[in-house]
Regions:
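S-adenosyl-L-methionine
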Residues: 1-41
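Short "lid" loop at the C-terminus of a central beta-strand within the Rossmann-like core
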Residues: 15-16, 62-66, 109-110
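Residue-level signature of catalytic and energy-coupling elements of molecular machines
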Residues: 30, 61, 115
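Short, glycine-/aromatic-enriched active-site segment of Class I SAM-dependent methyltransferases
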Residues: 62-79
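Short alpha-helix
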Residues: 83-98
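Conserved S-adenosyl-L-methionine
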Residues: 99-109
Length: 127
């Protein structure tokens, strides 16, 4: 993947501080599998730099979205109501604050570390 000229590698870059000067062009696809930070804190800069019609594929990890007091032993969120609330909150944020259209969410067929339930999200930036 690194050898593909269409891919911009930004290793050791804090995505919260992405700027247009760091990218050779406006991205048309953003893929996010982040840990230890919520999507709401991590993605605004990248989403703002994306071109109209861009696609977002993100992994929602409830253990990094809920408050520390709601994460169980071993860093696992076991409450299915909390899972749904996290997905609802991320969708609301993307659609309301970021003005992206969420096309689909689904439970990831692959569990996270130690069985954490995670969710995939597909969204598109309006034309």
């Amino acid at each position: 993947l690194v050898a593909d000229g269409r891919v911009t590698v930004l290793d050791n870059t804090n995505a919260r501080y992405l700027s247009a000067s760091m990218l050779p062009y406006m991205p048309d696809v953003i893929v996010c599998d982040a840990s230890f930070i919520s999507l709401q804190k991590l993605l605004p800069a990248a989403l703002g730099l994306a071109k109209a019609g861009a696609t977002l594929v993100a992994l929602i990890k409830p253990q990094f979205q809920v408050g520390k007091g709601l994460v169980g032993k071993g860093g696992i969120v076991r409450n299915s109501a909390l899972h749904q609330q996290v997905v609802t909150d991320v969708v609301w944020w993307l659609e309301t604050d970021m003005r992206w259209h969420v096309l689909q969410t689904m439970r990831s067929p692959i569990t996270g570390t130690d069985g954490n339930v995670e969710f995939l999200l597909l969204a598109r930036k309006p034309e």
